[in-house]
Regions:
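Noncatalytic alpha-helical scaffold of FAD-dependent oxidoreductases
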Residues: 1-469
Length: 469
């Protein structure tokens, strides 16, 4: 369908001596089985699978050091693997090599409730982490929808439905441990809430997509569970009406915890997938956190703003089971949308624009989508200016892929013109590489490349991602 790999000459077989060394060190935790390689050679991106030559399952930082050191010794590429939920081709072994599966590194290493921090291994998922925190009165709020691994969320600088209130991984990672391309271990940051000590290496690794090293520990900021939580939904005649409600809500300072947008087509898919009966119209999902009085005040204010923008059917969901059902439906929207076109794949956009430009960006995008022959539902974390179009294509029809990429190009060009970015939370991977020079300029890309080659001079760490070396 879509072929991201460099010419075949850039791939070479895994040296037999290295495979022997891996098996001697890790035994059955090394696999060259076709099924295992196939599982680790694809993600949720529209690209064709690109399989690694071997998969190693790590259980500790020492394991990671051993694998990285062998890759360095034999000049073999290495691709970190978490939960496999990437949408941009991060996990594809475009030059072969070793896929390093971190899913068994899934422990909570320490909880410091007084400091509101936790240190975890990269393979733990968001849901598992919050389950471990359940009795502390604290939670980790970053919620990308998929039950992604914390390591993958860190590597892509992810965000999600709660970003409007709690920020992204950029704000919530306090420090980390990473294994560099030569096997050395670097520790960054601290548990302190601020520091002026030297370069901010934590931020350098957050969003590096496995190209600078393998993250093996992450220290995260936690937040107290709110006293009261309430959710609501509201429908609108047009997408512009819904988006203007969000803009006004943000601009007057209402501290909403979540605000999600879904268009009519996305609502239709959610209804089918989750057995709901939501009105098939542009819809906002809200959530409010705070005291009982504060939540009530926030919700009433937002309801009034929605009414001024032709919002209708403002419905509350105060019982936990009702809120859970509502947000589960939103979190499953990606897979619900795929069911609109059985057998399809999705080309997913991820632009983010200044909140003042969100209405213009969404409304202009709507014009493009109306002219397309492809199903193109829209969802988004519109509270921070981020929205996604899932362009559904038949993987066996190249003309549909070409149309999808044309739509994607127009959306990205529009976002950049409006002062935004090509990717708000999914990362660059393979799919967004071509947009980076337009967004940042050649000098910035050259600076990024210089950092990459200073830490990984042979380009072994997840090569072929973000930019070429």
């Amino acid at each position: 369908m879509n072929h991201p790999a460099p010419p075949a000459a850039t791939r070479r077989p895994l040296p037999p001596a290295m495979l022997d060394a891996l098996r001697a060190a890790f035994g059955e935790r090394v696999s060259t089985a076709d099924a295992v390689r196939a599982h680790h050679g694809r993600d949720e991106s529209p690209f064709d699978p690109q399989l690694p030559d071997a998969v190693v399952f790590a259980r500790s930082t020492d394991d990671v050091r051993e694998v990285v050191s062998l890759c360095s010794l034999y000049s073999v590429p290495l691709i970190p693997y978490g939960a496999g939920s990437s949408l941009e081709g991060h996990l594809l072994a475009v030059r072969g090599g070793v896929s390093l599966d971190l899913s068994e590194m899934n422990r909570v290493l320490s909880i410091n409730a007084e400091d509101l921090t936790v240190t975890v291994e990269p393979g733990i998922t968001r849901k598992a982490l919050n389950e471990a925190l359940r009795d502390t009165g604290l939670f980790f709020p970053i919620d990308p929808g998929a039950d992604a691994s914390i390591g993958g969320m860190t590597a892509t600088r992810a965000s999600g439905t709660n970003a409007v209130r709690y920020g992204t991984m950029r704000e919530n990672v306090l420090g980390l441990t990473a294994v560099l391309a030569d096997g050395r271990v670097v520790k960054t940051g601290s548990r302190a809430r601020k520091s002026s000590a030297g370069y901010d290496l934590t931020r350098l690794f957050v969003g590096s997509e496995g190209t600078l090293g393998v993250i093996t520990e992450i220290t995260l900021r936690l937040h107290p569970l709110p006293e009261a939580v309430s959710a609501a939904i509201c429908t609108f005649p047009t997408m512009g009406d819904a988006v203007r409600t969000v803009i006004e809500t943000i601009q007057i300072g209402v501290p909403i915890a979540r605000v999600e947008f879904v268009d009519a087509l996305a609502v239709r898919s959610i209804n089918r997938h989750s057995n709901l009966t939501l009105t098939e119209a542009p819809t906002l999902f809200f959530e409010f956190h705070g005291t009982e009085a504060g939540v009530k005040e926030q919700a009433e204010l937002v309801q009034a703003l929605a009414g001024q923008n032709a919002g209708q059917g403002f419905e509350w969901a105060t019982r936990p089971e009702d809120r859970t059902r509502l947000w589960s439906a939103r979190h499953n929207a990606y897979f619900a949308m795929l069911q609109l076109k059985p057998g399809c794949r999705a080309v997913t956009t991820d632009v983010c624009v200044p909140i003042s430009q969100l209405a213009a960006c969404v409304e202009e995008t709507e014009v493009d989508l109306r002219a397309s022959s492809l199903p193109c539902p829209i969802v988004g974390h519109v509270g921070d200016g981020n929205f996604h179009v899932a362009i559904l294509i038949d993987p066996d029809k190249p003309e549909e892929l070409a149309e999808a990429e044309h739509i994607n190009d127009r959306i990205v060009e529009r976002a950049l013109r409006l002062g935004g970015t090509c990717t708000g939370e999914h990362g660059v991977g393979l799919h967004k590489m071509r947009f980076l020079p337009k967004e940042h300029g050649d000098t910035a890309i050259d600076t990024m490349r210089a950092i990459k080659l200073a830490l990984d001079p042979r380009n072994l760490m997840n090569p072929g991602k973000i930019f070429t070396c």
